[in-house]
A protein has these predicted regions:
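Active-site beta-alpha connecting loops in nucleotide-dependent enzymes
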Residues: 49, 305, 324-401
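Mobile, glycine- and charge-enriched loop segments
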Residues: 33-43, 128-129, 139, 143-154, ...
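Acidic, Mg2+-coordinating active-site environments of NTP-dependent enzymes
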Residues: 68-74, 180-319, 341, 348, ...
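Short acidic-hydrophobic, aromatic-tinged amphipathic segments that line or gate anion-handling sites
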Residues: 78-82, 405-421
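ATP-dependent carboxylate/acyl-activation modules
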Residues: 105, 306-308, 434, 442, ...
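Short beta-strands and strand-loop turn motifs
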Residues: 14, 69-70, 100-106, 180-186, ...
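N-terminal leader/targeting and accessory segments in enzymes
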Residues: 1-89, 270, 373, 378, ...
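Phosphate-binding loop of NTP-binding sites
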Residues: 6-12, 86-219, 223-232, 423, ...
Length: 455
């Protein structure tokens, strides 16, 4: 991080005199005092706990200066009105100072995978950095910016939204050169009036872009009203400017051809939605001068963020399709379609473990129930449901499947039948079986994956 104490003080409009402090260069910025090292800037954010309570600890760990909303005795500090606002302003300034090209990615489904793919492709020709983990909000994005290596040329930022306006703030901070909206679904519907408002929020990713900048968006009528007229909008999907013309799906890989590619591309991941993600990433990479040959080679050693549609092996030999980081109706429908289309192993069953999708608001039960259209005894032998809002879906499924092939386990404020669910999964799972696990992160299905691998 090529910034000094005095430079930061000028930028954030320090309310105190910092000229009495040495103009020391800073190593990095941290808001967790436990991660502070020698030469760091401490950023005491207010959350469940007030970061100001840990300023002393930060200096004990090596901090040379701290932002602060109040006077600090005995240590160098930069007095500001609001630490978070100063943190964000610092990140925006640093992007401007470095001149790095920013690529922003959002979407109700596929944003993390697309971010990973695009960063991987760009890294074949440029020094590239990307959002780590789920650092995609008003705190995580500036943290990512201030942690990128000094030689970064291309920065791929994931942008998430919980409320309308979240992405507007992030876009105005980052000023993307190129932006991608992967899909407009029902994620976080608890915080939005409807899917149209979700689309409005997602398309705010263009708010911080210059006129004529490239914006990739799904060919979806609900998004049309929010597409900016002053950007170069390229739509993707069936019949759109970018579309997949050929697709071969396998259990753990796929091959696809797009209308702008000369050759087919092979991917070491499953799911036709991942073909769309790869198509988007490929198109942007081509605009940046990455060759089609480089793209094809890069996809051969693609590594994605953990728990995104990942095949694993159970201890008993069964195949686990783990997709447990997050869930929304669109994502669950897509993974059920993908899993259902995969042929069963010889002598094996196909089992699905489905858990609650969170943050769907008043429509949650209804949206869960709609998943019945993607659940069929023709493709699945056994379905195990876990949660609260998923209970009615379990009842609907029990009317379609033979007795003993549908199970439901509660997770409510009063009762959590997680251990009983795990026991049933293990009793149902044979050595030649395939099992899908899908649910929101808070449903803790990652722990079930670990349990199946450890026994």
């Amino acid at each position: 991080m090529k910034l000094t104490i005095h430079e930061i003080a000028r930028l954030v409009g320090a309310k105190n005199d910092v000229s009495v402090y040495p103009d020391s260069p800073l190593v990095k910025a941290e808001f967790d005092s436990r991660l502070i090292g020698a030469g760091d800037l401490f950023v005491p954010l207010k959350g469940a706990r007030d970061g100001h309570d840990f300023i002393e600890t930060a200096f004990e760990n090596g901090a040379v200066v701290t932002l602060s909303e109040k006077e600090v005795a005995d240590h160098p500090y930069i007095l500001v009105e609001d630490v978070l606002t100063a943190f964000q302003a610092l990140a925006a300034y640093y992007l401007q100072k470095t001149g790095v090209d920013v690529f922003a990615v959002t979407g109700s489904n596929g944003k993390t995978t697309t971010k990973d793919m695009l960063a991987h492709l760009l890294s074949t020709s440029y020094k590239t950095y990307k959002t780590q983990g789920n650092y995609n909000n008003e705190i995580g994005l500036p943290y990512t910016v201030l942690h990128m290596p000094d030689d970064t040329e291309k920065l791929v930022l994931e942008m998430g939204q919980d409320h309308l306006g979240d992405i507007h703030l992030l876009s105005e901070l980052a000023h993307p050169k190129t932006a991608i909206v992967t899909l407009v679904g029902e994620a976080h519907l608890a915080f939005f009036k409807d899917r149209s408002e979700i689309a409005k929020g997602k398309l705010q990713i263009a708010d911080g872009m210059e006129k004529g900048s490239l914006l990739l968006a799904p060919s979806d009528p609900i998004a049309e009203d929010y597409l900016p007229a002053d950007k170069k909008v390229v739509r993707f999907g069936p019949g759109a400017e970018l579309e997949i013309t050929d697709l071969i799906e396998r259990k753990d890989s796929l091959t696809f051809k797009a209308n702008f590619l000369e050759k087919s591309l092979d991917l070491p991941v499953t799911g036709k939605y991942n073909a769309t993600n790869a198509m988007i990433a490929s198109y942007v990479a081509l605009q940046e001068g990455v060759s089609e040959e480089q793209i094809g080679q890069a996809f051969q050693n693609l590594e994605l963020t953990r728990n995104r549609t990942e095949w694993k092996k159970a201890d008993n030999g069964a195949d686990i399709l783990s997709d447990v980081y997050n869930a929304n109706p669109t994502a669950m429908k897509l993974i059920l379609e993908t899993f259902s289309a995969i042929p069963a192993n010889e002598g094996g069953k196909k089992i699905a473990v489905l858990a609650d999708m969170k943050e769907l608001g008043d429509q949650s039960v209804q949206l869960h129930n709609q998943m019945i259209l993607s659940i069929t005894p023709d493709a699945l032998d056994t379905v195990i449901f876990y949660g609260e809002d998923i209970a009615e879906l379990a009842q609907l499924a029990s009317q379609m499947f033979p007795i003993g092939h549908v199970y439901y386990f509660k997770k409510t404020a009063e009762e959590d039948q997680f251990e009983a669910m795990v026991k049933q999964v293990k009793e149902s799972l044979g050595a030649h079986d395939q099992i899908l696990l899908k649910g929101s992160n808070s449903m803790n299905l990652a722990k079930l994956v670990e349990s199946l691998q450890e026994d």
